[in-house]
From Swiss-Prot:
Function field: Catalyzes the ADP transfer from ATP to D-glycero-beta-D-manno-heptose 1-phosphate, yielding ADP-D-glycero-beta-D-manno-heptose.
GO cellular component, as recorded: cytosol
Example of a GO MF term: phosphotransferase activity, alcohol group as acceptor
The protein's name in its UniProt record: Bifunctional protein HldE
Organism, scientific name: Aliivibrio fischeri (strain ATCC 700601 / ES114) (Vibrio fischeri)
Active site per the UniProt annotation: 264
GO biological process: ADP-L-glycero-beta-D-manno-heptose biosynthetic process
């Protein structure tokens, strides 16, 4: 299955669960302490990242979705740091502050890409009354299209059955990242996302895929779930639904540096996708692609819609399609080694029309490979003003990547692609319109490197602005 990217601006998700603050202290180490046989780390870098349910919310917000987060914190400095970080990322925080408990904090000491030690500051929340967290959930349910319950067994989901019932009353789907072997407490949820270890803790050792499917269907029936998404590490994921064939999704991970927070990414992309109207199977395929990206990063990480678009368009494997700058530079080097002529152009391409297609076909005919550099949303807004772009970056790139004339699509955030072009240095740089060669961004750098710059004509009568004005005027 090759899913299409939804418009995550339309997603709205309530996340309830165990929030925590992940702190990273990092630096070089070159000696052993004289006090004990341990390395001495000279701390040069300190990072703070939301973890647990907060990481789920951060992932949804990073995609452009509306994330409303409810959880338990202390009245302390880590709670303030967590709230400040999340709100800067446009996550709406509605925490229950309990002065008798510390905010859950995990401090990791890192050196040379390795974790040397983890220090946990926590006292799991217990015997907390249901009313404060349930009332916050009730207030948020009217404005969301999906609920995620993120369970790290730290106490925030002590009243999880009440939470499931509240969501079911208003027909909002409930997705749960479970913890422990007691699936009874999650009875009635829409979908659970156990990893293989968690799944086998409940059902026993799984012999093969047929056994996994059979035992999974038993779990669905026994606990009144609608579905299970079993994450299986290097074997990918398996989606099991009531009275439907299983869907096995192979892993898309290329390199695994750190699985921290990968489960959070899976459930966040899954819930955000369903909340935009995506069917469950397509949402799971998107979550699988997202997991393949984040395990290649260190620590709890988010991903952008551009990274997700790259993953689902297969650019990492095929070498073509939507691609990042570093990958593009590598791909161009390989193309040159094959003796191929690389052509590059750029633009906003907000509403792709016949004039664009004609222009890109012409550009592609001038060489063997065509790169299209695309202005990001912020760049378009600065150039075109309020109300633009009509289509977000990921969608504009997806449409361009689907054209037969285009080999690579890459985003840039500056007002001009001069820096990007000077890094790529194509054999031929082309631009549409009535530009003078000397006024084309990146042209001087391409010519200095021995390349060419050309201006191509646009097809008369075709323009994005004209299309927008025609729509406003009601003309067909």
């Amino acid at each position: 299955m090759k899913p299409t990217l939804p418009n995550y601006d339309q997603s709205s998700v309530l996340i309830v669960g165990d929030v925590m603050l992940d702190r990273y202290w990092g630096g070089p180490t070159s000696r052993i302490s004289p006090e004990a046989p341990v390395p001495v780390v000279k701390v040069e870098k300190i990072e703070e990242r939301p973890g647990g349910a907060a990481n789920v919310a951060m992932n949804i917000a990073a995609l452009g979705g509306d994330a409303h987060l409810v959880g338990l914190v202390g009245e302390d400095e880590p709670a303030q740091a967590l709230t400040t970080t999340l709100e800067s990322l446009k996550v709406h925080c509605d925490f229950v502050a309990l002065p008798e408990f510390p905010t859950i904090t995990k401090l990791r000491v890192m050196s040379r890409g390795q974790q040397l030690i983890r220090l946990d500051f926590e006292d799991s929340f217990h015997d907390v009354a249901a009313e404060p967290i349930i009332s916050r959930m009730q207030q948020a349910l009217s404005s969301v299209k999906a609920v995620v319950l993120s369970d790290y067994a730290k106490g925030a989901l002590e009243h999880v059955q009440l939470m499931i019932q509240e969501a079911r009353k208003v027909n909002v789907p409930v997705f749960i990242d479970p913890k422990g072997a007691d699936f009874e407490r999650y009875r009635g949820a829409t979908l659970l996302t156990p990893n293989m270890l968690e799944f086998e803790t409940v059902v026993g050792k799984v012999k093969d895929e047929d056994d996994l499917v059979a035992k999974g269907q038993q779990i669905i029936e026994e606990f009144d779930f609608e579905a299970l998404l079993v994450t299986r590490s290097e074997h990918g994921m398996t989606l099991l639904r009531r009275n439907m064939e299983p869907l096995h999704l192979p892993t898309q991970a290329r390199e695994v540096f750190d699985v921290t927070g990968a489960g959070d990414t899976v459930i966040s992309v899954l819930a955000a996708s369903v909340s935009t109207g995506k069917p469950l199977d397509e949402a799971c395929a998107l979550a699988n692609a997202a997991a393949g990206v984040v395990v290649g990063k260190l620590g709890t990480s988010t991903l952008s819609t551009i990274e997700l678009a790259e993953a689902i368009h297969g650019s990492q494997d095929s070498g073509f399609g939507i691609i990042g700058e570093e990958q593009l530079i590598s791909a161009v080097k390989q193309a040159r080694a094959r003796g191929e002529k690389v052509v590059m152009t750029n633009g906003c391409f907000d509403i792709l029309h016949a004039g664009h297609v004609s222009y890109l076909n012409h550009a592609a005919e001038l060489g063997d490979r065509l790169i299209v550099a695309v202005n990001t949303n912020e760049s378009v807004q600065r150039l075109k003003g309020p109300g633009r772009p009509i289509n977000p970056t990921d969608r504009r790139m997806a449409v361009l990547a689907g054209l037969g004339a285009v080999d690579w699509v890459v985003p840039f955030s500056e007002d001009t692609p001069q820096r990007l072009i000077s890094q790529v240095l194509p054999s031929l740089l082309v631009k549409g319109g009535d530009y003078a060669i000397e006024d084309i961004a990146g042209g001087a750098e391409v010519i200095a490197a021995g390349g060419e710059v050309k201006v191509l004509n646009f097809e008369d009568g075709c323009s994005t602005t004209g299309i927008i004005e025609a729509i406003k005027g009601g003309r067909g």
